[in-house]
């Protein structure tokens, strides 16, 4: 809207309206002036830009002209390239046709040469040359030959005749080669066998060649294996390896089959084609024969080593042991057998008789596992270097299937089962024998049983590792855990359950002692001494056994990692589960140690502490200065008490293992604080009596701390706090120890507020009203 239109729309009938309108016009004029000034200020910039645009227009005309020229050149180049490309395609087509024509000519020439040469070679029995001609003929495209004959007038008859000649020659050569190969096999002419084996793929008989050659090798290996098996004992005797005679024969059999694959793999790859399945075909045939030879060997092994008879003995013995396990506590050690009842007479298999057999079985199983790994590695290298990637998985899967379904694998599973049966029997019976023959000399802390038992167990586990079987190793570890948790732990617990013969004995322990004396005969005067020594020795045995198990677990983890470096997650979980079972036995042994220590507590510590602590009641703790001086000048209670404790601990110091001795001191400290607290509650104190008690508690704590490498501070905390309460000068001093702003260690107090008040009432110089007013 213009200014005039705005003026026309305004009402200017009065002076005020005229002034208002004039003001609006002035404001509008000011705005217009500001815009004009802003535009005029940009005049130089606008003129500079317009000048630049003018200069650029001339350059744009030049660019437009050059762009048009470039476009014309590109169009011409594209047309030229399309023309050249068409000519190149026509030239390439012509070259391909010329090459095809040349190939047809060469095929025709080779066809005639081969048809003529093959007849001559067959007549001269030059099978290599005839096979070469046939291989060239088989490599030709038969349909292409016929099209060539149709295209070349007058040649169809000659081409057909040549093809017919070569086809007949191929069949004839195949028959002759097979016949000559069979004759070479009958004549045992290895050179001729290998000669014709290399000719088979040239005439297109890859499968036939592999089968015939593999069967020939199988026959040779079978004859050799039978001869060696008949002379196995003589060979082993000559080599001083009678105990490993059959393991050595098995090793020789497997090495022979593995050597055949290793030696002939390059020949097969060179003559039968790298990408073919000829090698896996040979492995399949050889494996079948290997199964047969190993089966014959194991039959002879089972017969001469009396495996079935010994297994039957083991099973019967196991059943009898299981039946005898229900005899309960009446079972005693007799005839070297822990679980065998007294007077029993059982014809049992001596573990030493099967020790050598077990060792031989482990060697046999390990050799088979090594054979499987070797064959897998040879096939893996073959497929990775020679077989197309898309076929590698199929060939390896076929190999795994062959080995998985082989009779050798099944027989190894059976022999592994036999091994586990015999190994378990050997381990359990050897452990029981070690327990039955347990001896210890005076001054020793442990008996011979611990070292003997763990030597046997380590031997069994390491022997299991040599089988190269994860399942077998896990089974043996589980058997070790069961053996320890059963016979071994029971043997340790038996004397501990009877209690420590110290003269302080409860009714249950007395009953057990009477039962034992009735079973073993009249008690002699030294039976108590032997019982005490045996109790402590078995307690030490249990303690040392926990250390042995920890060492055994650590050693096993290292040896397992070295024996089975590439384990699956499932196999790793199996091994970890077995080790967990073994560690659970360690916990059971710790519980046995705790049980034995509690027996010492009830039989030795508590009965002896009671009269000593009662002496505390004979000393007054309401003292004046003269009585305090007289008390300190004489033998104080704590001096008497420490002498008694020292004598008690010294009687066990050389008999207990360091860890058991520390545990005994810890139990003693606990019992001392409990009984001393009871005694404190029975008497009253004054200020000097509380001071004496505090000194006595400190001296007692210092002695017990110095008597053990373990910390007994926590066990003395409660009694120390009681002594602190009774040693207060004034009842108001308690706030310095109790209030959190004054004592940052308030949470370490082991006394409740009610207990604090109770002990403060023992001070006869503290008023009950003041004690009740305490804010705790």
UniProtKB/Swiss-Prot annotation:
GO terms for biological process: Golgi organization; intra-Golgi vesicle-mediated transport; protein transport; retrograde vesicle-mediated transport, Golgi to endoplasmic reticulum. It is found in: Golgi apparatus membrane. Pfam families: COG4_C (PF20662), COG4_m (PF08318), COG4_N (PF20663). The modification Phosphoserine is found at residues 342, 345. Its main location: Golgi. The keyword Membrane applies. It comes from the Eukaryota. Keywords: Golgi apparatus, Membrane, Phosphoprotein, Protein transport, Transport. It is a peripheral membrane protein. GO terms for cellular component: Golgi membrane; Golgi transport complex. PANTHER family: CONSERVED OLIGOMERIC GOLGI COMPLEX SUBUNIT 4 (PTHR24016:SF0). Belongs to the COG4 family. Required for normal Golgi function. Component of the conserved oligomeric Golgi complex which is composed of eight different subunits and is required for normal Golgi morphology and localization. This is Conserved oligomeric Golgi complex subunit 4. The gene is Cog4.
């Amino acid at each position: 809207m213009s200014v005039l239109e705005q003026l026309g729309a305004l009402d200017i009938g009065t002076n005020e309206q005229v002034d208002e309108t004039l003001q609006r016009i002035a404001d509008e004029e000011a705005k217009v002036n500001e815009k004009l000034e802003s535009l005029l200020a940009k005049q130089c910039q606008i003129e500079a830009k317009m000048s630049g645009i003018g200069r650029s227009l001339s350059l744009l005309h030049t660019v437009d002209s050059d762009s048009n020229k470039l476009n014309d050149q590109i169009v011409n180049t594209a047309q030229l390239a399309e023309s050249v490309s068409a000519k190149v395609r026509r030239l390439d087509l012509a070259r391909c046709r010329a090459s095809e024509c040349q190939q047809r000519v060469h095929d025709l020439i080779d066809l005639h040469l081969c048809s003529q040469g093959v007849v001559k070679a067959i007549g001269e029995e030059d099978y290599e040359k005839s096979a070469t001609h046939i291989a060239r003929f088989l490599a030709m495209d038969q349909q292409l030959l016929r099209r060539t004959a149709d295209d070349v007038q007058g040649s169809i008859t000659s081409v057909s005749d040549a093809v017919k000649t070569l086809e007949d020659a191929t069949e004839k050569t195949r028959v002759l080669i097979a016949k000559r190969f069979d004759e070479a096999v009958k004549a045992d002419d290895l050179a001729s066998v290998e000669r014709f084996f290399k000719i088979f793929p040239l005439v297109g008989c890859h499968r036939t060649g592999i089968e015939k050659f593999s069967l020939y090798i199988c026959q040779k290996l079978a004859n050799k294996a039978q001869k060696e098996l008949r002379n196995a004992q003589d060979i082993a005797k000559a080599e001083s390896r009678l105990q490993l005679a059959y393991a050595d024969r098995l090793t020789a059999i497997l090495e022979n089959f593995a050597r055949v694959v290793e030696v002939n793999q390059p020949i097969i790859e060179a003559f039968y084609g790298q990408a073919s399945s000829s090698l896996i075909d040979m492995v399949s045939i050889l494996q079948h024969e290997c199964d047969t030879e190993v089966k014959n060997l194991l039959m002879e092994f089972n017969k001469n080593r009396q495996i079935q008879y010994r297994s039957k003995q083991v099973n019967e013995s196991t059943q009898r042991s299981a039946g005898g396990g229900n005899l309960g506590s009446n079972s005693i050690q007799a005839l070297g057998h822990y679980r065998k009842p007294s007077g029993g007479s059982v014809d049992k298999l001596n573990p030493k008789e099967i020790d050598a057999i077990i060792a031989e079985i482990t060697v046999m199983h390990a050799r088979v596992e090594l054979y499987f790994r070797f064959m897998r590695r040879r096939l893996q290298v073959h497929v990775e270097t020679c077989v197309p990637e898309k076929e590698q998985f199929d060939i390896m899967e076929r190999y795994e299937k062959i080995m998985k379904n082989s009779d050798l694998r099944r027989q190894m599973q059976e022999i592994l089962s036999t091994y586990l049966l015999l190994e378990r029997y050997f381990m359990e019976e050897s452990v029981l024998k070690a327990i039955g023959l347990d001896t210890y000399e005076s001054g020793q802390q442990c008996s011979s049983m611990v070292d003997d038992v763990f030597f046997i167990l380590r031997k069994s586990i390491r022997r299991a590792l040599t089988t190269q079987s994860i399942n077998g190793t896990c089974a043996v570890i589980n058997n070790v855990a069961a053996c320890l948790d059963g016979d071994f732990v029971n043997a340790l617990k038996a004397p501990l359950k009877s209690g420590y013969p110290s003269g302080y004995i409860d009714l249950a322990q007395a009953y057990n002692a009477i039962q034992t004396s009735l079973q073993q005969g009249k008690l002699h005067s030294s039976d108590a001494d032997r019982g005490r020594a045996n109790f402590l020795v078995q307690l030490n045995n249990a303690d040392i056994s926990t250390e042995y198990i920890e060492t055994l677990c650590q050693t096993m983890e290292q040896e397992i990692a070295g024996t089975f470096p590439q384990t699956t997650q499932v196999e790793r979980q199996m091994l970890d589960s077995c080790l967990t079972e073994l560690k659970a036995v360690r916990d059971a042994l710790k519980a046995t140690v705790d049980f034995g220590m509690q027996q010492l507590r009830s039989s030795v510590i508590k009965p002896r502490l009671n009269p000593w602590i009662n002496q505390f009641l004979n000393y007054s703790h309401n003292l004046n200065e003269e009585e305090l001086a007289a008390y300190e000048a004489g033998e104080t209670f704590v001096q008497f008490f420490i002498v008694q404790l020292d004598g008690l601990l010294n009687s066990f110091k050389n008999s207990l293992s360091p860890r058991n001795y520390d545990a005994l001191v810890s139990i003693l400290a606990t019992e001392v604080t409990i009984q001393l607290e009871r005694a404190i509650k029975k008497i009253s104190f004054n200020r000097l009596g509380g001071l004496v008690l505090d000194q006595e508690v400190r001296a007692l704590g210092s002695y017990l701390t110095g008597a053990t490498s373990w910390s007994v501070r926590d066990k003395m905390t409660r009694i120390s706090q009681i002594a602190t309460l009774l040693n207060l000068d004034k009842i108001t001093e308690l706030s310095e120890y109790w209030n959190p702003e004054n004592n940052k260690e308030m949470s370490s107090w082991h006394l409740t507020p009610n207990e604090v008040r109770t002990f403060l009432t023992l001070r006869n110089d503290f008023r009950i009203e003041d004690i009740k007013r305490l804010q705790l």
